[in-house]
């Protein structure tokens, strides 16, 4: 499956000057919502991702995603696997588990995102699950921004990845493009202003 082709065909691979949820800047942005608005495509991607996870021998009971971007990807993965789905969300900038969701002691989870950049939000969700007695057995996403090592793709881990070393990450593909700290952004130096299309703070 050519995940980059799918993103480009559906207008989900954006070019411009973007302020990422991490606070850094990039010339490119992956807007997964443009793909996930088509349920049949979301289902196909989730089926493919579940097969990757299953073929790796990973067994799990439930899927958890950080809101907002990860919800549809995680829900579809849980649907493909016939597993329970819950999500975490930010309240006053702190990731929390609400809405009556619970975690059983020893319950095995996959934390699923639409896109993994550094993995910060996924890690926050994982810490909540583990604090409640659950076990995170793996991370998953439709695509990886190239910073974290993906078990099924064999790419190298970079220093900015926040995911734990001892938990595998599974995705359908890598998108690798430059990310800049605001003070070193070449786009800013041309007078361009970064726009924020994504998650935190919106």
From Swiss-Prot:
Look up the EC number in the record and give it: 2.4.2.10
Identify which cofactors the protein needs according to its UniProt entry: Mg(2+)
Top-rank taxon: Bacteria
The Gene Ontology biological process terms listed for this entry are: 'de novo' UMP biosynthetic process; pyrimidine nucleobase biosynthetic process
Record-listed orotate binding positions: 117, 145
Binding annotation for 5-phospho-alpha-D-ribose 1-diphosphate: 93, 113-121
- List UniProt keywords, sorted A-Z: Glycosyltransferase, Magnesium, Pyrimidine biosynthesis, Transferase
Q: Does the keyword Cytoplasm apply?
A: no
Any single GO molecular-function term of the entry would be: magnesium ion binding
> What is its pathway?
Pyrimidine metabolism; UMP biosynthesis via de novo pathway; UMP from orotate: step 1/2
What does the subunit section of this Swiss-Prot or TrEMBL entry state?
Homodimer.
Q: Which family does it belong to?
A: Belongs to the purine/pyrimidine phosphoribosyltransferase family. PyrE subfamily.
| Primary role | Catalyzes the transfer of a ribosyl phosphate group from 5-phosphoribose 1-diphosphate to orotate, leading to the formation of orotidine monophosphate (OMP).
Q: What is this protein's record name?
A: Orotate phosphoribosyltransferase
Q: Which organism is it from?
A: Campylobacter hominis (strain ATCC BAA-381 / DSM 21671 / CCUG 45161 / LMG 19568 / NCTC 13146 / CH001A)
Q: What is the lineage of its organism?
A: Bacteria, Pseudomonadati, Campylobacterota, Epsilonproteobacteria, Campylobacterales
Q: Which gene encodes it?
A: pyrE
